[in-house]
A protein has these predicted regions:
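Short beta-alpha connecting loops at secondary-structure transitions
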Residues: 6-14, 224-231
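Flexible, low-complexity linker and terminal segments
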Residues: 24, 29-262
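Flexible glycine/proline-rich, aromatic-decorated loop/lid segments
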Residues: 1-7, 217
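Active-site/ligand-binding-proximal alpha/beta "capping" segment
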Residues: 7-29
Length: 262
């Protein structure tokens, strides 16, 4: 979400199981075309090591999204404004090899044609145009591709990635506990209303509770408990159920480290 040289828009899509991964790969490519920016398809070790039997019908090819926004072809060779202003942040483009058009590319700030510029007014305009892509994506991407509220509860668990399967199964053993699974991590979805008045818990495969930090930053809602595991082993059902029961019963610390498999 934050890595890279300078600040630029990118989308981060985290798959929760193998079927998600198959479909999300297609979505990531479609979004990269649509928004003309980087899309990170985030997987993890446990998904990569998992085997699963799925019906053939599940592996469907998704219909193409919005047609690529192409620049008009020129009658004779000529430059065109590859980085022209656009209300939604996405400028029309010509694929490489398009007859009659050409443009310049540079890693420095550039004008509408692609020439390097240090003009501060133009710099602001180009930066604001690029970053507008995030808001456009947040508004256009269907909510079901951003997050899924599998069940609501006074204790609301948030997770991403391969914790999905374990936490969905854990719900069968827990009363009053809900699960909100996040798929689009950036731009962060507008989930603050779903968190209102809940005891919030994140369950994650990392040391610090990265999702908890992100949720607090983007929603201004405090995450009350962080359940983390970082020993290279997946979170198991019994671990998840035991720790979430402790949260529900009010006897859990703010940070819970899972160590099964050591």
């Amino acid at each position: 979400i934050r890595g890279g040289h300078g600040e630029y828009p990118r989308l981060v899509l985290a798959s929760g199981d193998l079927l998600d991964a198959f479909l999300d790969a297609q979505k990531a490519l479609a979004w990269a075309w649509r928004y003309q920016t980087v899309v990170v398809h985030l997987l993890d070790k446990f998904l990569a090591s998992t085997g699963q039997v799925l019906p053939k019908e599940a592996f469907r090819v998704l219909p193409p999204g919005e047609e690529k926004r192409l620049a008009p072809k020129a009658g004779k060779p000529a430059p065109y404004a590859r980085y022209a202003p656009a209300k939604d942040g996405v400028s029309p483009f010509a694929p490489l090899g398009t007859q009659g058009v050409f443009y310049w590319m540079t890693s420095d700030e550039h004008d509408f044609l692609g020439h390097i510029t240090e003009d501060p007014v133009l710099r602001e305009a180009q930066m604001e145009k690029r970053m507008q892509k995030l808001q456009t994506a947040r508004e256009e991407i269907p909510k079901e591709d951003q997050y899924t509220l599998y069940r609501d509860g006074e204790v609301l668990v948030l997770g991403f990635g391969s914790v999905k399967g374990t936490l969905l199964e854990a719900l069968d053993h827990l009363e009053g506990v809900g699960y909100l699974h996040l798929r689009l991590l950036w731009p962060f979805p507008e989930i603050a209303p779903l968190l209102e008045g809940k005891t919030l818990v994140t369950v994650e495969h990392n040391y610090s509770g990265q999702l908890a930090d992100l949720v607090q930053q983007e929603t201004l809602k405090r995450v009350h408990h962080r359940v983390v595991k970082y020993n290279g082993r997946p979170i198991t059902l019994d671990e998840a159920v035991a720790r979430l029961k402790a949260v529900k019963e009010g006897r859990a610390p703010k940070r819970l480290v899972l160590r099964k498999g050591v």
